[in-house]
Amino acid sequence: MLKKYIIITGSIAALMGIVVFINSQITDSVTQLPNPNIEQSDKINGQVPPNTPTKTMFESRLLTQDILDDRGEPTGWTIVTSRSVRDKGTRSPIHVHPHGGQTCVVSGEMSLYLDNEPDIQKAGPGECYWMPAGRRMSGVNSADSRTIMIDTFVVPKGDQVWIVVEPGMKDAQDQFDKLFHTHK
């Protein structure tokens, strides 16, 4: 069991080293403001995604856990997981993740609109999709009902999990900050 834990921890640490470099290209590490090179836009691949951009209806944090190295010492990284409910006919504001993450659908259906990706990724109950770091995206509720999903991110302790880049939607920025940005 300890060997498995060490392998998992080592793999996460290596991945996070790569993510740190990517993060430095997305946000200013002091202010956490979007890098001016990230386009502020209401479009993905030249088109406005379907549905109305909103905050989710409900968010609850399920897990906040510091990641430890093989000696049991904190690595400076934290895994955070939340459960959210998105109403039918809505979508997330266009945003960027400084560090990648995944969404797993419990009920309903989500469609990921991802910049520079012509195919829309759909996930139904029991399915997940990956949200890569540094790319503009929007999660669209493509079901005829509310959708319940679980989001998981591994981030440097105290970092944001997303940066809203859709004009007029800056008030949605604190949607996750209240859940995730308080894990300092």
Model-predicted segments: where are they?
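A short beta-loop-beta micro-motif enriched in histidine and acidic residues
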Residues: 74-77, 89-104
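Short acidic-glycine-tyrosine-enriched beta hairpin
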Residues: 117-134
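Glycine- and acidic-residue-biased ligand/ion/polar-headgroup-sensing regions
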Residues: 98-117
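Short beta-strand His + acidic residue motifs that chelate non-heme Fe in jelly-roll/DSBH
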Residues: 94, 112-113, 131, 136-143
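A short, N-terminal "cap"/entry segment at the start of jelly-roll beta-barrel domains
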Residues: 8, 20-78, 122, 165-184
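Short, surface-exposed secondary-structure edge patches
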Residues: 83, 102, 119-121
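A short hydrophobic beta-strand segment most commonly corresponding to one strand
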Residues: 144-161
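N-terminal Sec-pathway targeting helices
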Residues: 1-12
